[in-house]
Amino acid sequence: MFGKGGLGNLMKQAQQMQEKMQKMQEEIALVEVTGESGAGLVKVTINGAHNCRRVEIDPSLMEDDKEMLEDLVAAAFNDAARRIESEQKERMASVSSGMQLPPGFKMPF
């Protein structure tokens, strides 16, 4: 199944990838993305740990329907969450690229 030194090399690659993933997770926790709704009238900024850092609401919305404003805030947060997930997937792909895995082997993440 594994060629000469294959298992040792695979273990070494797995350890290197684990170190890269740890570093990537630390970096992504610092990344901030901003989601928007209502054509930018509501903006929500979250970090890589999905913690809300900032909410910006255009003053024109303060006079409108409270329920609509709540919906816009939720939509902006969901947009930000999708953006941070996309960022995480991109970084994860770069961490695992180049690792030579046996056919059919799937990573546990």
UniProtKB/Swiss-Prot annotation:
The keyword Repeat does not apply. GO terms for cellular component: bacterial nucleoid; cytosol. Keywords: Cytoplasm, DNA-binding. Signal peptide: none annotated. InterPro entries: YbaB-like_sf, YbaB/EbfC. GO terms for molecular function: DNA binding. It is found in: Cytoplasm, Nucleoid. Residues 89-109 are annotated as: Disordered. It comes from the Bacteria. PANTHER family: NUCLEOID-ASSOCIATED PROTEIN YBAB. Binds to DNA and alters its conformation. May be involved in regulation of gene expression, nucleoid organization and DNA protection. Homodimer. Belongs to the YbaB/EbfC family. HAMAP family: DNA_YbaB_EbfC. This is Nucleoid-associated protein NT01EI_1109.
